[in-house]
């Protein structure tokens, strides 16, 4: 009884269900739907958009004799008109001098003004009746109007089906007013779309819908509905846009109408009105506007290929052309794509392979797989570019993974490509699992392939390959195998297994894992290389270390090999200075004098670790870190450069470049460190890019290769990764409740070229390592709202070209040797642009463009003070020679 009273008091006076029309009355209303597009800032009058208005007649045709709440109503649009939402447009208005009938076209206007029938039961839409074969865009506008007549007069939450789909709605009733709040995120409707699942590279979208009804005499006097759709890129919030869509319905008058049609069955009534009426879904239907005068795929490619020449890849225009062509490829057929691939020359072909693979459609995948021959040694570069594009796929599917598994089981012309295929399979497993695809059959097969391969592998190369795949996949099931290889494997294998464990999230680093890492660091069972021990320590310190774990690590400083002492001391100081999660525990332990004393904290050496901010805002941060470990003889053992991007607490490992060297002590007649006496001469570079581990490259391997490089006194830069990457890829097709179709897209791409070199000169007693990273970045966002006869759009974007170089110089002509580390950033041009437009299907349009440019000065990133002092010595100005002599 109390529930009944509460429900009644919260409802509109005298009614507990939906709208009710009076018999024999024709309701005459005015209706308008308008849409505004902008970046979400400033006055709506600065927006682009349009308004569609009309008169509307509503009449009750039939009411069930069994109850007032079962009604059939007829809705008719009349006198349709188009106008600007921006009254200041004046002479620039696209509608000026044009009749609405000319713009909408005769057949569309006739369809729009044909009546629709709405069968309402208890205020909810039972069926929507219209004529077959009407244009979907026009039908949607009528669906948008008809959906406004669905409502209830009592408060409560329910599910309704209207033009937006099957949605959760909440009603709030107050005397003569009812407010309907639709949870747009809950709407079930089939629409194309995809997004980048990673928070850092993804977008945040918001959607709200509020409709207010003013009721008199059981019918609406006025309806105001507002739907807002907003979108912004998480890490660059200037890439943002908003759609405001409004509907207004207002009662002007009522007049006498035809009498109700008698009968018990609504179907008979509809047939009597017009037998051509048919029930169709009230949910909005998909339509595509035809592109007039658009180039073919081949014509588009010919117009942009000059921007994708190798010499032009450092420019943002290359990325712009790449992104635009991907959009076109997504509508292309396999035969069209293959034709272009087969006709292209070898200079531009790698960039074309990047684009075709990044399109991520069934046709583009079939085309590229038909084109590439993995048994050939002549197309290795193209095969590698295909695999890298797969690794960075924004929304990979199971078919792509299955294709790579199939290729892996076949034969290869290059063993490097075979390794890359397995490594990229690991990356795809990770991405699919992050997108709730871990139980897909293809993913399960890939997991078995990686774990089974690692368990059975006997050759060193195969073990490395499967470990690198696991480093990308990060399968929890692989942790026991990683522990085995870390603790019992030989040096390089042990180190790779440890760095693979290092990539796992905190919940997976269990007490068992940390016990193993402690045994390795403290060498309880066997002697390990410095690189393995320091990685084990990093895993402990990163994953909620206990008091005793931190204390034991601090107590070990002073008992370690000289350069490892300095390295671990730098790691601890960096933790304290940069406020990592372990900082609190380290400070607590340092209160003990046994751990915190001068002897322990005054160890000398050249190894170092430093972390700093590239940029920091209230919601995001970008950090860089550089740690370098030397052997006791002064030769580089490992350098590790990392750049992370954070959105709140979510990290993206943007770049990691690791240079490793071993077995070089014989060159300067030095004694190897403990546990490293039998290592082969080797130097190589390993890169991780946007959370994907790539196949490492080798500078030299073995003594003879080393001698040839050394006698040349230099090493040519080796390409680590080069290509065009699609990193940000978001596309939404939206059904606005007004009936208009909207699209929201964000794309981000970059052209990247990372090279590494190691120079070693016995003559000058000097070694240098260089890592150079050049990128061109373009991010674009686009929003359109289309009615099929008029379209409004907003495009925003940002672009830049940047370079970052890391140089490590070691002079070992004296002891202690001199070490200088440099991280240099070049001047960075930064450009932002905004385009707004309105366009008729007849071709007439309005366009507004804005552009802003700035230059961010280059700089050398600060490292620790000791490094700055050392660099002054290494690069001290040479004194001018005095001119003394015989002449």
Swiss-Prot record:
It catalyses: a 1,2-diacyl-sn-glycero-3-phosphocholine(in) = a 1,2-diacyl-sn-glycero-3-phosphocholine(out); a 1,2-diacyl-sn-glycero-3-phosphoethanolamine(in) = a 1,2-diacyl-sn-glycero-3-phosphoethanolamine(out); a cholesterol ester(in) = a cholesterol ester(out); a triacyl-sn-glycerol(in) = a triacyl-sn-glycerol(out). InterPro entries: Lipid_transp_b-sht_shell (IPR015819), Lipovitellin_superhlx_dom (IPR011030), MTP_lip-bd (IPR045811), MTTP (IPR039988), Vitellinogen_b-sht_N (IPR015816), Vitellogenin_N (IPR001747). The keyword Disulfide bond applies. Residues 21-655 form the Vitellogenin domain. Its main location: endoplasmic reticulum. Keywords: Disulfide bond, Endoplasmic reticulum, Golgi apparatus, Lipid transport, Lipid-binding, Signal, Transport. GO terms for biological process: cholesterol homeostasis; lipoprotein metabolic process; phospholipid transport; plasma lipoprotein particle assembly; protein secretion; triglyceride transport. The keyword Endoplasmic reticulum applies. It holds the Pfam family MTP_lip_bd. Gene3D superfamilies: Lipovitellin, beta-sheet shell regions, chain A, Vitellinogen, superhelical. One of its GO terms (cellular component) is endoplasmic reticulum. Disulfide bonds join 167-187. It is found in: Endoplasmic reticulum; Golgi apparatus. Residues 1-11 form the signal peptide. One of its GO terms (molecular function) is protein heterodimerization activity. Heterodimer; heterodimerizes with the protein disulfide isomerase (P4HB/PDI). Interacts with APOB. Interacts with PRAP1. PANTHER family: MICROSOMAL TRIGLYCERIDE TRANSFER PROTEIN LARGE SUBUNIT, MICROSOMAL TRIGLYCERIDE TRANSFER PROTEIN, LARGE SUBUNIT. Catalyzes the transport of triglyceride, cholesteryl ester, and phospholipid between phospholipid surfaces. Required for the assembly and secretion of plasma lipoproteins that contain apolipoprotein B. May be involved in regulating cholesteryl ester biosynthesis in cells that produce lipoproteins. This is Microsomal triglyceride transfer protein large subunit. It comes from Bos taurus (Bovine).
